[in-house]
Amino acid sequence: MPLPLLPPLLLPLEALLDLALHLVDSTGVAYSARQVTPTAPLPRLRGSSTSNDVTDNSGCKELTFIFARGTTEIGNMGTVVGPKVGEALKSLTGNKAAIQGVDYPADAAGNAALGGSGGPKMASLVETALKQCPDTKIVLGGYSQGAMVVHNAASKLSSGQVVGAVTFGDPFKSQKPDNIDQFKTFCASGDPVCLNGANVMAHLSYGNDAQTAAQFLVSAAGL
């Protein structure tokens, strides 16, 4: 199934942050549906921005989570939501989850590739994980550009290789990925990427959905 055209408002993460700064007036109040202020503390980040349980062949776990970060995020997991989902999965499964980030450029130019710069790498990681641990349950996740990576990777996989997937701020939120039965997407109200909204901070809020996403993936895996 061909992927839809890229929404015109899909901006790189650093551009979203720059725009967010310009939305703050002299009183220090950000124009956001959630009334985010620059003096309010950001949510505490949990987990690491890099995780390589598959590529390091760290041992078989009941669940394997492969995640693609958003544009310009650091490491291979990013910081907005990937590490938080990973930590939640470990907690919910009693540390029986392997976590792997997709090492792809995640640069602004990659948005035009509609996930093509990371999709093949994510699909390859799925194959590697199943070769190392045939009984593990594979689940996928992606944020922003990384969400497109999930769609691209799914089209290269066979039915049954991946039991579930979640995406956040997904430009293709209306399209269920190929070959994945259990799929859930998170799109915050006002998100300029998945809803063509005007609330830039909404696109950075998906850490709030990490626990719900992890619970969905654990259920999809039958654990």
UniProtKB/Swiss-Prot annotation:
Catalytic site: 144 (nucleophile), 191, 203 (proton donor/acceptor)
Compartment annotation: Secreted
Pfam families found in the cross-reference section: Cutinase
E.C. number: 3.1.1.74
GO CC, one annotated term: extracellular region
SMART domains assigned to the protein according to its UniProt record, in alphabetical order: Cutinase
Family: Belongs to the cutinase family.
Listed name of the protein: Cutinase 4
Gene behind this protein: cut4
